[in-house]
């Protein structure tokens, strides 16, 4: 007969379970998920000042079209150590025909490509590379966090109620992109994982309840590697 301790399974080793105290900040509009994620990260680092944040948005001329490279420049503005990993250094011309990108593609292509071109001179760290789940877990195990671009139509939270978990932009009555075959870009903040259950913990700025979301590693991988994301991930370091 197995003892209660044996039935519970082997004890977790250091690094097997990480759950960082990253505060949840809800987005206000359908377009500002990346900015809400940046606020979460800065607050976690103890560097969020709302007035300074608004001044930074004006200085960097951030509008309603926010790309991951914009968030990297924002982190640099606040002196936050970061590393932006992506599969595409610039804008993928193939996105021009995707409904999510189509509306602002022509005007944004030049702006975004210029940001990539100037990144090194501006000391914004950008790398073209592939990131594994193990890389992400090792980063989180050190107390660091990451902002990840995902396809919200694929991402599935195991903790959220059914009417909400497939909706990316529900706050304040704004347009809701429910689960559809089309790509819907959305930023989330990674805050931990559980190796034993094979799950990833994250904050979704689209809603504050339940506060922390959780999904399987396989679902997370599907969402972050969907065509349209460029596998963008912005690593942010605690020792900033």
Swiss-Prot record:
Domain of life of the organism encoding this protein: Eukaryota
Protein name, as recorded: Protein GUCD1
Species assigned in the record: Homo sapiens (Human)
InterPro entries associated with the record: GUCD1
Disulphide linkage map: none
Classification via Pfam families: Guanylate_cyc_2 (PF09778)
Gene: GUCD1
PANTHER family, per the entry: GUANYLYL CYCLASE DOMAIN CONTAINING PROTEIN 1 GUCD1, PROTEIN GUCD1
GO biological process, one term: response to cAMP
